[in-house]
């Protein structure tokens, strides 16, 4: 049980540090895109992200 929890925590930390965790953004966080910036989602000051609908 402890090993599984430690493994899961390590995996989550690894994915978060690699930038794999995707956080949807709201329309007021979007900035204008240059050509070729993002092939999916919208551009934010931190990078590309999916746009939250509401």
From Swiss-Prot:
It is found in: Secreted. Disruption phenotype: Impairs pathogenicity. Leads to clear reduction in lesion development on cucumber leaves. Induction: Expressed in the plant infection stage. GO terms for cellular component: extracellular region. Residues 1-18 form the signal peptide. Keywords: Disulfide bond, Secreted, Signal, Virulence. Its main location: secreted. Disulfide bonds join 38-48. Secreted protein required for appressorial penetration of intact host epidermal cells and for pathogenicity. Belongs to the MC69 virulence factor family. This is Secreted virulence factor MC69. The lineage of its organism: Eukaryota, Fungi, Dikarya, Ascomycota, Pezizomycotina. The gene is MC69.
